[in-house]
Amino acid sequence: MKQIKIAMVCAAAFTSSLALPSLVSLIPGVTVASAYANEQKTKRVPALREKVYSQLARAQKLADDGDSQAGLAALDSIKERASSMNSYEIAMMYNFYGFIYYNENDLPKAITAFEKVISEEAIPESLLLSTTFSLAQLAMANGDYNKTIAFLEQWDSINTKPRTDAYYVLKSQAYYQLKDYEKGIANINQAITQADEQGKLPKENWLVLQRAMYYSLNQPAQVVTVLERMVKLYNKPEYWVQLGGMYGETGQEKQQLAILESAYQQGFLTSKAHLRQLSQVYLFNGLAYKAADVMDKAITAGVVEPSAKNYAFIAEAMIQAREDEKSLPYFAKAAEQVAHGKYEQRLAEVYINLEKYEEAADAARAALDKGGLEFESNVYVALGMAQYNLQNFDASILAFEQAEKHKKSQRLAEQWIKYVKREKIHAQTLRTALL
């Protein structure tokens, strides 16, 4: 037998799903046979007579065999003689109307029929309770959240046993949909506390709802607590990622790094967004080489696109990791994909640091040829330095003279020009002395 399933909640959205049960599973234990054989004795109710029982059993069989219209027709025939039926028999008739409409996914008619069941006074208390609770579930599935709460409160007013976790969860879901998060969180917390006290594992969708409620209440610390429990109990990739995000949001960068790194090692981080996030977290925490490695592997695996931006990220991370040599191929790949010369400029600067002056001069010239530079003066400075170290003093002076035209690098260029001119004279003097 299928059962009505509790509505599920996601991080930022709430959706309810209703799996339609078979004709007689909505209200547990109530079939024509059970109603006839085991009438509730907690209150005086009239008997379900054999004649009515057989007619209801026929309608039930027709519906169970898949002929809902024939089942409804049989019930219509019974309804024509309702004046001769007692309250319990009428209630059972509407009960089966409700079942058939429910199986036909006609929730409004099902609700109307079940409301007629509980409107009859002389019915067993068990039928009254189960039907009222089912009405709350149906109202929830039908999107009538105020009515859901009203039915739950009606059920609570006649229920003499401890409230069930299903009561608190359904009420919490309705309040969530109504955006009354304070009442919603109180109810879901009660359901979870009750399960904890009984030594039971809270259902996963309860924690999902609790997390969503705290998020809506702007209580990130509570969201973290719930997600920590979800990771421990259910170990799903999305919970690890969400917990990492919330650690970042609450300023717990070390915990964020630890949880995301662990998720990565378990193979939970597979999407482009998640791998980029891990790379950025590594970089933020001073683990630049790991940042570059994650991005490089993501590109190789085809998860992250081999774009200029991503290659440049790897290259800059390598620079931060003091792996200048390893940055070169990534800057080169980035440069191949764009029309501007910014990445050739970075190549020139890295080559200078590596004392590869021929390559630095070539890269600087390529950057100037492509153009589109934000700081053109820096390229002329790099070119001037490369030419100086190659002892191309005149070319060096020309490059620094171009840099001098830019206010940003004017003073530095002037100093270099003076220095290069002195070195040129010194080199000429030395050559003359050696002749």
What is each of the regions a protein language model found here?
Residues 308-322, 329-377:
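Alpha-helical adaptor scaffolds
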